[in-house]
């Protein structure tokens, strides 16, 4: 979620040039005012231009989906892309689908309800996206129509999502059952989230897409495994692959 740190790792620590970096969600869009992110872009534009790098953001559950329409956050070197965006780079065709369930959503809703009056009284709403800590449209969506349209023009070899198919780790987020004690719909919603990824995978398989890599975040840990010819890679916070 820290754009400065991301650019530092990309351009200074790893000294990467001519590189497209795709962030697999939880960029932090929406916790601050829009102006904050615009400032980040201005602060890092020169460094990104000099290295000829780009960063594409896929939405996580710690992001306001309003930023991911392809226009709200769209700069020369930084863009937050809509679900079902296709990226073509370095001879790869990459499908991006964001979204996941926040297991701590009840806590975040309550926390916001405590804070919101104090926060909103200081904010001008004109041309701004209101801050929040939780967005109810955070879940991933399976869109068969978009997949069918994509299948006409593209052969996907790489997938970037925030969560993962149900046969991938982690099989359960830590403390999930604890959070579920006060959130009766949580376990079902989390299961549905993974099933959406299963449907995505199924669609790619039955349409003979040569998928070889699938990258995801969400679980704040590192793991990888080759399953049925696809290398699944779970990325930790700020982990590059």
Predicted regions: what is each one?
Residues 92-195:
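Active-site-proximal loop/helix segment associated with metal-binding centers of metalloenzymes
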Residues 86-96, 158, 226-232:
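Beta-strand-turn-beta hairpins that frame and shape the catalytic cleft
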Residues 3-90, 178-180, 186, 190-196, ...:
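Core catalytic region of metal-dependent phosphoesterases/phosphodiesterases
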Residues 54-58, 73, 167-241:
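Conserved beta-sheet core of the metallophosphoesterase superfamily
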Residues 2, 85, 99, 138, ...:
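Adenosine-cofactor binding site in Rossmann-like domains, unifying the SAM/SAH pocket
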Residues 6, 32-33, 66-69, 106, ...:
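Short glycine-/acidic-enriched loop or helix-start segments at secondary-structure transitions
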Residues 27-30, 62-64, 99-103, 163-168, ...:
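Short, solvent-exposed loop/turn segments at secondary-structure junctions
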């Amino acid at each position: 979620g820290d754009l400065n740190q991301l650019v530092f790792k990309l351009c200074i620590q790893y000294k990467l040039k001519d590189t497209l970096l795709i962030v697999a969600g939880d960029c932090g869009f929406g916790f601050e005012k829009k102006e904050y992110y615009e400032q980040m872009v201005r602060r890092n534009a020169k460094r990104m231009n000099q290295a000829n790098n780009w960063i594409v953001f896929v939405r996580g559950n710690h992001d306001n989906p309003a930023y991911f329409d392809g226009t709200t956050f769209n700069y020369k070197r930084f863009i937050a892309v809509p679900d079902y965006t296709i990226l073509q780079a370095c001879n790869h065709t990459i499908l991006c689908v964001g979204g996941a369930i926040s297991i701590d959503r009840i806590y975040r809703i309550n926390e916001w309800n405590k804070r919101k009056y104090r926060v909103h009284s200081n904010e001008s709403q004109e041309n701004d996206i209101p801050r929040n800590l939780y967005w109810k449209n955070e879940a991933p969506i399976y869109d068969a129509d978009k997949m069918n349209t994509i299948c006409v023009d593209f052969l996907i070899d790489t997938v970037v999502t925030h969560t993962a198919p149900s046969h991938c780790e982690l099989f359960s987020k830590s403390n999930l059952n604890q959070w579920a004690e006060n959130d009766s719909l949580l376990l079902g919603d989390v299961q549905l989230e993974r099933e959406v990824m299963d449907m995505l995978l199924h669609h790619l398989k039955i349409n003979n897409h040569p998928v070889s890599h699938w990258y995801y975040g969400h679980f704040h840990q590192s793991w990888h495994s080759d399953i049925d010819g696809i290398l699944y890679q779970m990325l930790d916070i700020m982990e590059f692959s």
